[in-house]
Amino acid sequence: MNEEYDVIVLGTGLTECILSGIMSVNGKKVLHMDRNPYYGGESASITPLEDLYKRFKIPGSPPESMGRGRDWNVDLIPKFLMANGQLVKMLLYTEVTRYLDFKVTEGSFVYKGGKIYKVPSTEAEALASSLMGLFEKRRFRKFLVYVANFDEKDPRTFEGIDPKKTTMRDVYKKFDLGQDVIDFTGHALALYRTDDYLDQPCYETINRIKLYSESLARYGKSPYLYPLYGLGELPQGFARLSAIYGGTYMLNKPIEEIIVQNGKVIGVKSEGEIARCKQLICDPSYVKDRVEKVGQVIRVICILSHPIKNTNDANSCQIIIPQNQVNRKSDIYVCMISFAHNVAAQGKYIAIVSTTVETKEPEKEIRPALELLEPIEQKFVSISDLLVPKDLGTESQIFISRTYDATTHFETTCDDIKNIYKRMTGSEFDFEEMKRKKNDIYGED
C-alpha cells in the first residue's frame, strides 16, 4: 500500500472500472480501491435478495414465494446496452466480452393514450403498426430512408438541410410529420428525455436515430442487449482487464483521507497507510465537497410474478412513456428483465421504473408506469441526487465521475468516460487505445 502509483481509483462503478482498465492497458500503474465489500458502487447488482430488503430497510425477510435469495441479482440502476453503441465497442476492443454473455432484449414499447405499443423494428412491423395512419407511415418511411442515407461527409445526402444549422423541428416540418410521430421519433428512437432537442441543430438527432437503427439491424428484435447475471458483471469484467495489466484491487477499504498539497492531489490514506499518486479518479461519494447537485432521479424496483400486459409475454423489454403523454417535462422509463437473464427466481420478473424528479411528490410522478405493471409483489423506492463535479479537475488532478442519469442506456456514461479521459491525458479518447496488447497473457480460468 505504501507505494507510488500513476493513478489511484476510488469506487468500482462502471465509469471507474472502465477508466482503470484503459489506464492499465496504457501502461499506467493503477491502484483501485472501494469502501464497499462488493463491486459496482452505485451501479451494483445486489445479491442475495435478502440484501436488497436490508438495503431498502424493508422489515422481515423475502416471502417463500420469492424462491431462493441467491437466485436474484437486482440492478440498482436500470440500463440496457445499445447493440451498436459506445459501451459495446469498448467491450469488443478490450475483449472483455469473453467474460460476459448477453441476451437481446425482446422488444421496445412506447406509451400512447394510456396504452403501450411495440416500437416497430422491421418495415413489415412499421406498416402493420397502429401507432400511425397509412399516409403518416409513408411520410415516416421517407424520413427514415433520409436518415439512413445521411452522411455527414457527403453534402449530396443533405437534401437542402444544413446539419449544423437547421433545427430538428424544421426537419420534421420538411417531412410533414405529425405530433405523435415526432414524440415517438424523438423519445423512442433518438432517446431524448425532454423536448429541448427540437430547437438544436439536427445532426445529433439524426446520428442518434442512426445509432438506434444500426443497433436494431444487428439483432432484429430490439436495439438493446443485457448481460446474464446483471449489470454488475460489467464493472467486474473491466476490473479483471485492469488486473491482467497489473492493476491492484482492494475492496472493503475504508478511505480516510484524500491528501492534497498546494491544491494538487498527492495520495490517499486508508487504514493509517498512505498510497501516493499523480492522478485520482473517483465517484462523487468520495469527494462530497467537490461536487454539486443538479437534480434528482427516482427509481422504483418492482418484483412481478407475471410479464407486463400487452408486451406479448416478453421476458425482457423497455417501455418509454414520452413526457407529452403524461404532462411532464421528462420521459418515464421502464426496464424489464427476468429469470431468463439469471437475475431472478424462476417465473419472476424485475421491472425498474425511472425518471428525473420534477415535483415534491416523485412517487406520484411515476404512477402511469406503475399502473402498467400491476399487480406488483414488492416495491423498492430510491431517490438519488444527480451529482456533477464542480470543476474539470485539471488543477487538483482529481477527476470525478458524474452520477448515473435516468436514461436507459449507457451512451451518456460513455460520454463521461471519454470526457474524463481527455481531461486526464489531454488527448481525445480513441477506441484503438483500448486494444489489448498482442503479448497479452490471458488469465485462463
From Swiss-Prot:
Main localization (coarse): cytoplasm
InterPro entries xref list:
FAD/NAD-bd_sf, GDP_dissociation_inhibitor, RabGDI
Say yes or no: keyword Phosphoprotein present.
yes
Residue positions of the PTM N6-succinyllysine? K57
Query: What does the entry list under GO cellular component?
Result: azurophil granule lumen; cytoplasm; cytosol; extracellular exosome; extracellular region; focal adhesion; Golgi apparatus; membrane
State the membrane topology: Peripheral membrane protein
The record's account of tissue expression is: Ubiquitous.
Pfam families hit by this protein: GDI
What are the record keywords, sorted?
Answer: Acetylation, Cytoplasm, Golgi apparatus, GTPase activation, Membrane, Phosphoprotein
Q: Which residues carry this modification: Phosphoserine?
A: S61, S130, S382
Q: Which residues carry this modification: N-acetylmethionine?
A: M1
Q: What is the annotated localization of this protein? A: Cytoplasm; Membrane; Golgi apparatus, trans-Golgi network
Q: Would I find Oxidoreductase among this entry's keywords?
A: no
Q: Which GO terms describe its biological process?
A: negative regulation of cilium assembly; negative regulation of protein localization to cilium; protein transport; signal transduction; small GTPase-mediated signal transduction; vesicle-mediated transport
Q: How does it assemble?
A: Interacts with RHOH. Interacts with the GDP-bound inactive forms of RAB3A, RAB3B, RAB3C, RAB5A, RAB5B, RAB5C, RAB8A, RAB8B, RAB10, RAB12, RAB35, and RAB43; binds RAB3D to a lesser extent. Interacts with DZIP1; this interaction negatively regulates the interaction of GDI2 with GDP-bound RAB8A.
Q: What functional role does this protein have?
A: GDP-dissociation inhibitor preventing the GDP to GTP exchange of most Rab proteins. By keeping these small GTPases in their inactive GDP-bound form regulates intracellular membrane trafficking. Negatively regulates protein transport to the cilium and ciliogenesis through the inhibition of RAB8A.
Protein name per its UniProtKB record = Rab GDP dissociation inhibitor beta
Query: In which organism is this protein found?
Result: Homo sapiens
